[in-house]
Structure formats: structure tokens, C-alpha cells
């Protein structure tokens, strides 16, 4: 015991000696530290502490996590359904989600697709990606049990997929070395509950801070509460900092800002502003610098032209607009959207022709659309021909007295012949002749002027009609029959009109007469030709309605009533015929 006590007294003596030596040596260090710049000293007595930015990174990250979403009671919108309250309380009480906010989207204009199809947008914070996944699984189970529905989720990345990803990276060392798989995945689950148009967003805290969905869905008068504000103190650089450290500071401070407006929308607005201010050079320059948005630019120009009034359209410099539109056309059309490009092109040039025929005629449309499409290796379809024939008819009937000469319509029809030659299988004639709408429109291009007065008709029209009768007879398409009747009625060729109508009668059987009877009677009544009306009533043509057991539709009855009224006004009485047909 004496030896132990002596040893302890000796160790205490040695400890005191060593402590004195350490204090004496540290006095030099303290004197040296006092000579350092003041930015590295901690001041007291009503002074602040100045610390370099690279020592405050951890504090900054902790500050970012202090959001405005404090623990609070859930505020429900007025007149909200019970399902919303049930789901929200389940998220809070059972799943442990925090900072739950509900936005009422029933009123207001929102640009996002989710906002347009939802009434309530719920946003909640989870503690981890695993918490997000578990919360979705349990919420989906609740929806199945309580509401007999299945939720739809976007952004799901479960543990099984994470394990597959890890195994794939393990097999490829290069990918694994460059991967940030050791960093926890930041999750965002967007869930359509399929109940009362309720959508739920479950996000991790950092992800919620980064995306800031609240600013997107908040009402206009509350949006300022959720705007992201960057600290101005942290963004201030000290003049004595090294350039490398300043670059690192900017790298740490940067945060990606998400925009809810697509770049194409901004560029299209700028394009429209240039065109409305007649800055065509600026518009073409904008298009050339953003070739990837060519389809969006074409839609913008097309929609603007379609919204013009007829009176204002005549004052538009169409040549410059056409040049701007052509500059949108890509050198190589993408196959997946080629049909959209051609559809926009056809409609755009059609609108220009209708708006200003003097400066953009039908020949220019033929070159800019049909010939251009054929030269680029795309086939001319039946719909292309139908639209071209319609436009030709509009141009012919809109030119007044100029279009009523026989040789004028011959010249017009030469362009129609050129269009037909562009069809690859035109030699067979099957694709054209068997299309009733196409035949009808083709025949209408062979008649000039308005339908209310006698018009010129090409001699070749009769040859085409005879060919149709010989080829198809009673099996001719009803639409084609209607087209032939309109052409013959417009030319007042009534003998040919009646001969064509009865040409295929021999091949008909009761119950199989599908000819357009209402159109046949209507054209005669609209013509006002008293001789033709008397002939139709007195020569027994209407008796075929009973012989072939034609179904008496409302349209046929309406036209028959008009026909008999015309006969009464001319002193013709056919009460027995009327009763026989209507019975």
C-alpha cells in the first residue's frame, strides 16, 4: 500500500510538470493565432462571426431543409368530398407523412395536364424513398378496400428495381465506378387515386424543395408564399477569395430551376410576335436557329391564318408569309410525323388560295402541294385529289362571268388531268372509279358557274358517265350517283338526267334499291323547271318507290311533299299517286 501511494504521488508530480510545459508551449501558438486576419477570429461583445463559405456548406444544407411547411392541421377546401378527408387523414395518421397541403383545382386555369383532369391535388412529404414506396403500397390497399378502385402511379421505383440496378452495375465495373448509386435516390410519386379526381404527390423533403410543386398549383393570390428565394448574403463573393474557391462556391450554391412552360411555347409566342409586327427576317432567323421545333412553328402559322377574318385577309402580305412557312419545312421529313407536315401544308395553302385568289391561284396550289409531295416521293392519295377538286370547284364558281365560258373550263380541267396523272395506279382506274366521293367531285369540276343558272359542261362528261354506267350499272356507289345527278342538273341536261337514273333499273330487285331518291327529287324541285316537275309526276317515275320497296325515310317524305306542293302550284293534282306512295 505504501508503494502504491508513493507511485501515485509521483505520477501527480509528473502530470503537473507536463501540463505546465504544454501551457508554456501553447502560449506561443496563441500569440501566433492572434496575429491572423480578423475573418478567422471569433469576436464577442456585440460582434458577429465571419466564416468562409466553404465552412458553411453544411449549415446551408440544413437551412435549405427548413421549409415553410411547418407541422399544421390539414386545411380542407370548401365542399370537399369525404373521400378527400379520409385519404388525407390516412396519409397523416397511419402513414406518417408530414407537411400535407391540399390545393383545390376545381376553379382556375392551369397549364399542366394533371391539373386539368383533377379536382384536388394533395402534396405530402415522406422521410425517405423507402417511405414513399411503402406509403403508396398502403394507400393503394386502402383505395382497393374502401373505394373498390386501383390507383395509378407515376415515378415508382421500388426496392426490387433498385436491386436489379445494383446487380447490373456490379457486372459492369466501369458503369459502377461512374455511378452515384451510393447516394440515396430522391423520390417523387404522383398517384391518381381514381376517386373523386384526387391526385396525391408523395415526395422526399429534398425533392419537394427542388421541384416546388406548391408554386405550380397554388392560387394566384397565394403563389407568392411559395416562391423560392435565394439568399443574397451567400451569393456575395469576398474580394480576397481565390478564383478557384469562388467557382466551387457557385457550384455548391447552384440549384436547378424547373419551368412549367415548354421551350416550344416560348419560341412560338416569339415567332407570332415577329410575324404580327411584320418582322419576317427575325421570324425566319428564329426558325433557322431552332429547327427541332419546325412542326410547332408550322402549327403556329397555320392557326394564326385560320383565325383571320376574310376582310382582313386581303391586306396580308401572303408572299412573305409563304416564304416564312416554307422556311419551317425540314430537309428530311421524320417518318413518324410526315402526315402531320403534309396535312398542315395542304390546309395552309388552301386557306391562302381562298383568302386571296388573285395573288395565289389554283395553279400555285398545285405546284406547292401536289407536285411538291409527288417530287419528294410521297404518294398522292384519294383524299389529296378530293381536296384539290373541292378547291378547283370553289375557284371556278367564284370567278363570276370569267369561269362560265366553255374554253375557260377546258383550261381549268387540264390541271385536273395533270393531278390525276400523279396517282400511281391511275392507269387501272380502279382506285378512282370505285371511290364514289372522288368520282362525284371529279364530275363537278367539269361544270362551270353556279348551279342556279344553265352552265357549260365538258363534252367528256358524258363519256365519263357512260363509262360508269357500263362498268357498274345498278351497283354504282350512291355517292357517285349523286355526283352525276348534280352535274347533269346544273347543266340542265334533263334527258340525260332521266336516262342515267333509269339506266340500271333492269338489274334491281325489290328491297335492293339504294339509289339516292331524296337527292334525285330535290334537284328537280330546286331547279324550278315546271316541265321537269310535271314529267316526274305524270310519267310514273315515282311508282318505282313502291315496286322496289324503297324504305320511306323522312328525307324522301320531305322531298315528296315539296314536289307535290310544286305540282299544286302549277294546277297539277295527283292525290291518288300521293296516297298510293305513302301507304
From Swiss-Prot:
Stretches the record annotates as Disordered: 163-183
Q: Where is the transit peptide?
A: 1-29
Q: Which residues form a coiled coil?
A: none
Q: GO CC terms on record?
A: mitochondrial inner membrane
Membrane topology type, per the record?
Answer: Peripheral membrane protein
The compartments listed are: Mitochondrion inner membrane
Output the Gene3D superfamilies linked to this UniProt entry: Beta Polymerase, domain 2
Q: Where is the composition biased (Basic residues)?
A: 165-174
Alphabetical GO biological process terms:
mitochondrial gene expression; mRNA stabilization
Per UniProt, the keywords (alphabetical) are:
Membrane, Mitochondrion, Mitochondrion inner membrane, Transit peptide
- Domain of life, per the record? Eukaryota
Protein purpose: Probable mitochondrial mRNA stabilization factor.
Give the family this protein belongs to, as stated in its UniProt record.
Answer: Belongs to the ATP25 family.
Question: What's this protein's name?
Answer: ATPase synthesis protein 25, mitochondrial
Source organism of the structure: Zygosaccharomyces rouxii (strain ATCC 2623 / CBS 732 / NBRC 1130 / NCYC 568 / NRRL Y-229)
